[in-house]
Amino acid sequence: GAGTSGRLGIVDASECPPTYGVPHGMVIGLIAGGDSAIRKAVEFAEDDPTQAWKDLTEHDASAKDIVIGIAASGTTPYVIGGLKECQQNGVTTGCITCNPNAPISAVSDFPIEIVVGPEFVTGSTRMKAGTAQKLTLNMITTSVMVKLGRVRGNRMVDMQLSNDKLV
């Protein structure tokens, strides 16, 4: 993703290893503009339709993976370009967008369109759209971890005990 959407993908991915005991790198979040864009906007990085595939190949994306593009508007060139390349290379794709019939949905095997309506502050997607995307990401990773056997009943069975509160 780019901007808020990319940051949310990174947050969700970073929570999987300590919560479910999966290896770092099993769930990866990428943001247009690279890691420096996590804390400070890298202007125009989202406009490059070729960079996402370059970023994905650095992580050895293959037909064994699923790549989920996150774009509130559903029009971000970085995300759409990455999903197109994934499909051309046999990688299963999904997307999370907040606009119906968005261009990103056309390049996704499994599109998720969450219609939240206009933001209170026009042009900002970190409010309703961002909240809806975060909830959806949590549902996806939780369901995957349940299917992978990382949850029994309602308990995380491979959680990494990393502080006194958890021990």
Identify the function of each model-found stretch:
Residues 2-135, 144-148:
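Glycine-rich phosphate-binding loops that contact phosphosugars or nucleotide phosphates
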Residues 138, 142-167:
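Internal, active-site/partner-interface "lid" segment
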Residues 1-2, 162:
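Proteins with a high burden of low-complexity, intrinsically disordered sequence enriched in S/T/G/P/A and R
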